[in-house]
Amino acid sequence: MEGLKDKRYFIVFDDLWTIDMWRWIQEFAVASNNRKGSRIVVTTRDVGLAKECSGDSHIYQLKPLQPVDAANLLLRKSRKRQEDMERDGNIVEKLVKKCGGLPLAILMVGGVLATKKVAEWRQFYDHLPSELETNPSLEAMRRMIILSYNHLPSHLKSCFLYLSIFPEDFEIKRRHLVNRWIAKGFIKARGRVNIEDVGKSYFIELINRSMIIPSRVNVEGTVKSCRVHDIMRDVMVSIARDENFVYLTADDNVTSVTEENFRHVSYHGRKFLKECIDWRHFRSSTMFGERPIEPPAPLFLPSTRMLRVLDLHGAHFGITKKDIKDIGLFRHLKYLNIGSAKAYSNVYRIPRSIGKLKGLQTLEIRMTDISTIPNEICNLQSLRSIRCKKTHWSYLGLQPSMGCLMDMMYHQMITRNSHEKALKSRMPCFRHWSIYKGVSVPRGISKLQELQTLEVVDIKRSDANAIKELGELVQLKKLGVVTKEATEQKCKLLCAAIEKLTSLYSLNVDADYHGSLEWLHSVSSPPLPMRSLKLVGRLGEMPDWIGSLTHLVKIYLGHSELKGDKTMELLGTLPKLMLLGLRQNAYVGKSLVFGARAFPNLRELDIFYPDRVREVIFEEDTSYQLAKIQFRGGRCVEFIGIKHLPRVKEISLGLGARVAKLGDLQGEVEAHPNHPVLRLVEDWSMHNIDPSEHEALEEELANFRRQHQQERSTNNRKWWPWRQRAQSVFIFHHIQGSNVEDDGDDFFSCTSHDEDAC
């Protein structure tokens, strides 16, 4: 390389693996004082290594091919035409998806398919995992993935293989994954660095090494969930099986294995491992399929007592009390998730034997009927996370007016619809049942000094001393509470507790759509590290203390009934605010004004059913960073000043959105130098409403609502007259899978955001 010192050169270093190699290249291979316009290009799979080689502006991240381009490449490589695929056209789509849009994978698969008839393509797709192991034409692709695995540091190899327990194309939430890694002992604390932060760094490192694919990113650019490339997963499962690391059960698998030292089992079908297996070796059990048909319940045998992780969240059947009655036997459990997101759960009480799980760190009991945390929980001083948002009444198809047992029982007797079965299954739990989505916490909660996440606490049903003790949870970072119908005294105790939580960075207070949060004005010194704030309930005006939250990144307000200029002026001063969510009468003024020099860091604006807002105005020199506007459910609203938003990329008008002057808005969008996208969910004809006609319609609707409210109030006070109305139809929405309201630090839905704060 000495001869390059005085020459102009162009060098490509392909597939660089380590930073040490790059440092050697810098020190010995390439002259640093060459001023002849030379260039060096480095290719690598590691984003972190790329950043060592160059600044962000000189890094090009190769994107997967678009589906059409990927399909064309596959057909061209396999020497087939589109006409050849008419009988089984979707097989191309499936193969392209399997390859993840990666050109190298498509070329290798296409090369194999070139030797096969079209009729054989589906069989090849079905047996691709075994083809990767046996087909010489695919050996290079398998070898490339194994090489990537072998280059992982030792602390990442187990973390990576653990991903093989999840089904193909499954969205894996970072929070769940990191908590499971911690429970399994894959992650160790480093000095003063929080163990969760170490786990997050492992997660990011796997992304940077292109071993996993980001699937959901929040407004700050933080990756909240990931997926594993299909072919990468096939090879990963093969490695995990060869190393006796994970055993997967599925309907097409045999139900016995000769190896006796698998560490993790994942159920994807209805098959069950035979009892001849030595269960004592298993350390984690995860359920994704149907209830096993053999052996029958209970799900877990006494011989599985060495389990560290038990996760039933992905089960396609309702968890029952019988399934978890012996939970106290699993003394080594560190991670427990018993709330199924795929089916009704009939668990309404935590067994008191849970107090024997002294090492338990994570307790997930959401999507259950559990409404009370037992006293025994206070003995589990290793607990770091309790998430216990219970099944809401709407999940059963009930109305909130059914506040008493008599109403619900009578409703069941006189109706014959799809809810009857669901209600019958819950009859034993009615004495534990409440219509609120929180759970009561016991006295002694302050003993849980390691606790960092606690949600959702029902303040009304919790003891006053327990509420006071919340302020003693000095490590608490995320708190969710419901205050519907809570007394003023308990709300004041909650205020005092919040002021003591100096580590809190996420707070969610829900008083329901007609409840009051005006007691929040009495907060004098809020937790200054707070980054995420969600308030649902009437505020009247914005509390002054919100202006002191200089680290606040996300704020969501619902049913707040805010008005006047103070609201937007105060919010506009928050220097780090990136996401503003206003929902259903959060603001009740006619003009929502984003003033000059306000909202310096705002990136996303989400407005949902602003019943009284008629215009959204962006003044000059406002919201310089605003890139995305989502508007749903508002009527006769006019957007003014889009031209003043230099970085806007997308304006989305969702279901129920009605724009008064859509043509004017489209004109501003078309004239904008940034060429933003204007998305319309509903037809153009639904917009351009005449304001005068709209005002008359709104008045008529308001009168109807008032009359309906009076009738409902009267009928709730008189049970017998209500009986005659009970046969009304109740609309039931059964939400499954990743669409279930779950984690979020961006508040609205799992499909677009994630509720985990920061």
Language-model regions, residue ranges each:
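Alpha-helical sensor/transducer elements of the RecA-like P-loop NTPase core
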Residues: 37-90, 108, 123, 140
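Cross-kingdom leucine-rich repeat
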Residues: 3-4, 9-10, 34, 251-263, ...
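Short, polar loop motifs at secondary-structure junctions
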Residues: 17, 44-50, 269-272, 292-293, ...
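A conserved switch/coupling segment of P-loop NTPase cores
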Residues: 1-65
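A short helix-loop-helix "switch/interaction" segment in the helical subdomain of ASCE P-loop NTPases
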Residues: 90-101, 148
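Surface-exposed helical/coil interface segments that assemble multiprotein signaling complexes
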Residues: 3-5, 30-35, 85-86, 112-159, ...
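The conserved phosphate-sensing helix
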Residues: 99-108, 153-158
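Mid-core helix/loop region of P-loop NTP-binding domains shared across ATPases and GTPases
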Residues: 1-12, 94-98, 198, 202
